[in-house]
Amino acid sequence: MKIIDEIILYENPDPLLVSKQGIFPGIVKLQDNSLLALFTIGQAFDSADQRTYVSKSFDDGRSWSKPKPLHNHIYKNKEESESLKPLLLQNNKLLAIGYAFVRPDSLTPIVNPNTFEILPLNNKISISNDNGESWSMPKNFNVNETPLEISGPCIQLQSGRILGAAPPFHLKESDHSGWISYSDDEGENWSKLSEFYKSKEGHISTWECRLCETNSKIIVIFWAYDNKNKKNLSNHVVISDDAGKTFNTVIDTKIRGQASNIMFYKDDIIFTIHCHRENPTGLILRKVDVRDNKFSILDEINLFSKDGLSSDDTNISKQFGSLKFGQPSILHLNNNELLICFWCIHDNQHIIKTYIVNI
């Protein structure tokens, strides 16, 4: 594997005049082979004015259109800072699914640094019927009355069912689990299908879950964090043979990564990508064989490695607040190319960056 191109999808065009920080990207390929990216722009990493923006590429990710807001709603009372990821349905309808924090004012942080309580969170969905040119105002939905950290894209199974993987969003020392949620009516109604992971003591979080469907399996990868001992664990993987209803024993990948992602390639081969925020740091793409419910690395490449990428891991709140890069994704462009997308800090600005990788 080798990098053949490096592109900035978004950066603040006027950094000396205004603060516009780009974070949390997600990309889908549309029916006409164009690419659509959703990402968040706000004044700061946790600012109350964060909104979802839309950008398109018509040349396999080599250039991108000027981003435009997904919606122009003006909040009269409390603002909502949002993050949404795209999903293309089989009927070519587009969904943007994620969450928004309800902000009482512009200076109250998402996480209370003393109590670790988080602000109220609403799960959100928006719909586009015109290839992403216009979108409905994001509306609330709920899964068992539980706010979920839906930070990654949902998937639509071959059966038509939509699945999402996410944990209930809280920072307590226990009562953590990873949920599979589903919708059988294109996102109108949602329910909990299963728990893909829960530790015996409930002290391990399943942050930034991502999932994919292979020919016969559902695979979920997640950032495992031990809240009791306040430390990161290796990325973990779970596999389902019955469309997400039940999951086999968890697989410790032995990869010391945090935010990660996963893409089905062919047969029993997947690609994974991992943010390594503990030394040695980097953004590592891996080709993996998952035959017989194992995790065998076939090849890997470090795409993004430089000094100063590590995070403060004193506790999970400080870790969230000191991130330098994250939320990587993998998109298969053609037989030999993958598009890797993530956010990172460059010249004191949060930007959206991509790599084209020949595999």
Question: Which positions does each model-derived feature cover?
Answer:
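Asp-box/BNR beta-propeller blade signature and adjacent active/binding-site loops
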Residues: M1-I359
